């Protein structure tokens, strides 16, 4: 079988982009079992309740991510919501650890994707948005959409 190349998106965490202001993005590998990878190849995953923690040993973990059991799996299947280790360089982990010490900052998973046949997680150092920030972002998005619609309508009339 030929080796995979390129990127293929599995799942995005749209709620994280809405609830947090993204500061820095990182790409992290994931330590997974075989049935987890097979389930991800079918596009079955959810990051809606996922969060990232750093333990005392300086290891990063993806927790709360739901990767359902592989349908054709046997007794060797995985637990859907188990902790999964994130693979990053030591310097990146220490930089992120220093970042979350600041008030209001956290690390959130943004997406899972395949890159050259390996599962990667896009994670970000993020600051929580206040309610008015969320409304402001929605308003700006809506204004942009209306402006595009008006320009399209004006172009059609000529």
Swiss-Prot record:
Required for rescue of stalled ribosomes mediated by trans-translation. Binds to transfer-messenger RNA (tmRNA), required for stable association of tmRNA with ribosomes. tmRNA and SmpB together mimic tRNA shape, replacing the anticodon stem-loop with SmpB. tmRNA is encoded by the ssrA gene; the 2 termini fold to resemble tRNA(Ala) and it encodes a 'tag peptide', a short internal open reading frame. During trans-translation Ala-aminoacylated tmRNA acts like a tRNA, entering the A-site of stalled ribosomes, displacing the stalled mRNA. It comes from Bifidobacterium longum (strain NCC 2705). One of its GO terms (molecular function) is RNA binding. Keywords: Cytoplasm, RNA-binding. NCBIfam families: PRK05422.1, smpB. GO terms for cellular component: cytosol. Transmembrane segments: none annotated. This is SsrA-binding protein. Belongs to the SmpB family. It is found in: Cytoplasm. GO terms for biological process: trans-translation. It holds the Pfam family SmpB.
């Amino acid at each position: 079988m030929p080796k995979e190349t390129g990127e293929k998106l599995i799942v995005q965490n749209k709620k994280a982009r809405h609830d947090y202001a993204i500061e820095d993005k990182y790409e992290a590998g994931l330590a997974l079992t075989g049935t987890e990878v097979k389930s991800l190849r079918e596009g079955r995953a959810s990051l809606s309740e996922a969060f990232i923690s750093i333990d005392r040993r300086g290891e990063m973990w993806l927790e709360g991510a739901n990767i359902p059991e592989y349908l054709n799996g046997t007794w060797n299947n995985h637990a859907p919501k188990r902790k999964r280790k994130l693979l990053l360089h030591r310097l990146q982990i220490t930089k992120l650890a220093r970042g979350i010490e600041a008030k209001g900052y956290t690390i959130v998973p943004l997406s899972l994707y395949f890159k050259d046949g390996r599962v990667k997680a896009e994670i970000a150092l993020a600051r929580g948005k206040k309610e008015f920030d969320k409304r402001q972002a929605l308003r700006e998005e809506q204004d942009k959409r209306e402006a595009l619609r008006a320009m399209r309508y004006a172009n059609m009339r000529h």
